[in-house]
Amino acid sequence: MLAWRPGRPDGCQAAGGRRYNPGHDCIKASVSLNSAARNAPAGSQPVKAELWKRVYSRVGSYWKGLVLAVLLMAGAAATQPTLAVIMKPLLDDGFSGAKPHYVWFLPLAVVGLILLRGICNFFSDYLLAWVANNVLRGIRGEMFERLLGLPDADFKRGDTGRLLNRFTIDAGNVTGYATDVITVLVRETLVVIALIGVLLYMSWALTLIILVMLPVSVGIARAFTRRLRRINRETVNMNAELTRVVSEGIDGQRVIKLFDGYDAERRRFDFVNSRLRRFAMRSATADAALTPLTQVCISVAVGAVIAVALSQANSGALTVGSFASFMAALAQIFDPIKRLTNLAGKMQKMLVAAESVFTLVDQTPEADAGTRALPEPVRGKVEFRAVSHRFPDADRDTVSAVSFLVEPGQTVALVGRSGSGKTTLVNMLPRFVLPDGGDILFDDVPIQDLTLRSLRSHLSLVSQDVVLFDDTIAANVGYGAGGTVDDARVRDALAAANLLEFVDGLPLGIHTPVGQNAARLSGGQRQRLAIARALIKNAPVLILDEATSALDNESERQVQASLERLMRGRTTLVIAHRLSTVQNADRIIVLDAGKIVEHGPHSELLAANGLYASLYNMQFRED
């Protein structure tokens, strides 16, 4: 396996020749960076209050369903103390035969109360699930909207696992725990208040003993809150790391097999898996310790209640029915109190998940300060004026004072060694990368003055790494037109891309699904499908980013023929690795270390015997 994976923390790269453990060092560095970035601010009270406000402002948008659910929970809560109250007449009068109608009335009352509680609980749970799922849909919609608007640089960080976890796990935890908190807080609080009322009515002296122990239980719960918050935050981080490691194992399975990377990948996975287990056990330990400690406090109170009750019974101040009713109410109060004390853990998990979700929602979208649209008709003139760019932490400019003009309909090829700045330069045109200096003009209009929608609507891209969506061939081709297009246009585009014959041979023709990552298509077929998509868009400026570099000779020939049709009448910027594909360009610009060192037609550059000639001759010797 490789000694260093791009996009991981700096500590992962071996310094001074030191070899690191690929199953431990990078993951450890990544986890510690995640933890450091996420720890301190989240624990502050203002941040917690802001998270609460943001979560429940979204829940409050569905206040009608919420209010109805609360009323139903109140109805369910009212049945519990009533069941306890029934114990007194049942024992004092029912068994003595003093009131014969109790023989049928009390059993029916018990059944009716339990039935009422079941109905109220069902509909309140349904309404809360309705609220939760609507809020979840809204939050995920906000997250996806922000995801689509993030700058291109944000996607270069390689934190795919963390992003996926935010959508699949964190967003669900926010709404799930938020409604759980409402359910427990409302339902169990009402039950506790009602039962305490019954207890006070039965015997205020016995009730005071119970009330003395409640603050102790609350204090224990608060003591565990901060620890649970930290543990849950680390668990979220480790879940993201686990997702990333598994995702890399799936995507890189061929490399793992060919380079015998089984042991390295097992070590990477075992490290994350074991660390996740440790945090899960810490969380489970804290949760498990909270309940028995609370129960010990309650049991002390129960022991004191029994002692005082026996004393009152001996003096005739307390009947058997009253004591049984009191104990029934007391027995019912334990579970609600337990659920209320456990609420701290759910609150912390909700806040950790909310922090993760809103971190994405609050990220700054790509700058779109332009207000102009390209004047019609769009000609396709492109000019770079002294454009420079340096990536953060780089020791030199990736692109340095580059200037050139591409007239409408011209084809200009950018060539040079790897790292010479070709891709960075071209990525500035659609504003995926922003220049640090200089200007880029599209039809004599500075691109920063244009809206992103106007600018990008007049650009098409065909790259080496073709992105196709898990949909039909027709849908992928029609994507270039921004939506559904008629079958005739799709077929025309496929024909121009030399792909129609293949597509017609499929059982469903143009309506055949391409599968995830277009796994059912070959590399050449994917490229030609991307060309058909660009043909449908019919933009005046075309960017070709090493579109044929990964193809075999036959596929390259077919794709090259399709590209020639696509390039006709369009301004084209070509990034080429195979110099044989750019010989017919109107002009070739040779870059080295971010600067233009040569430019001109193919024949002139060969005759000049400079860098271009050196690269060209080197390739043909290799061929």
Curated annotation (Swiss-Prot):
It is a multi-pass membrane protein. It catalyses: ATP + H2O + lipid A-core oligosaccharideSide 1 = ADP + phosphate + lipid A-core oligosaccharideSide 2. CDD domains: ABC_6TM_MsbA_like. Its EC number is 7.5.2.6. Residues 382-618 form the ABC transporter domain. In MsbA the ATP-binding domain (NBD) and the transmembrane domain (TMD) are fused. This is ATP-dependent lipid A-core flippase. It comes from Bordetella pertussis (strain Tohama I / ATCC BAA-589 / NCTC 13251).
